[in-house]
Amino acid sequence: AINHALETGDFTGEVYDAAVAEYMDRYCNYWIGEDAPECCTRPKKSGSESYVEGWGPNEFAPTGTLKDFEYIDKLDQIKIPSLICSGISDLCSPLVAKTMADRIPNSKWILWERARHTCFVDRHDDYCVELIKWMNQYD
């Protein structure tokens, strides 16, 4: 369904919506239960206007104002310490995360097993330990 949408430019319909839901469950969504971190359970204020303007109406083929934005050659201009965290099953592939880590001076990359785009949820306790250790280096 996603390939069909990319080929036809039609990102609508129940089959496409179901495929996107499955994709997001595999690579992004987090569970919400009684043990979920507070950041996952508090009320959200969200909208799609800026996302659609910048990226476009779908996750897979950028058509918005950022579609031609390229920043890889500018990553070395980041001068503050940077912590890059990603999951093995992340929307941000390990290749993308490693590219950032390799090009941002004074950066550290953590690739979490058993984690998706929301590694701060999927590996919450481990994430907090690593984040505090990293922050203490620069405080």
Task: Locate each region found by the language model.
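Catalytic active-site module of serine/aspartate enzymes centered on a nucleophile-bearing elbow/loop
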Residues: 106-139
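Short amphipathic alpha-helical patches
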Residues: 46-51, 98, 123-127, 139
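Broad hydrophobic/π-residue packing in well-ordered secondary structure
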Residues: 22, 28, 86, 117-118, ...
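Generic recognition of cysteine residues
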Residues: 28, 39-40, 85, 92, ...
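Aromatic-residue hotspot detector
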Residues: 23, 69, 93, 134-135
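Alpha/beta-hydrolase
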Residues: 2-76, 80
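Conserved loop-alpha-helix segment in the C-terminal half of the alpha/beta-hydrolase fold
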Residues: 65-115
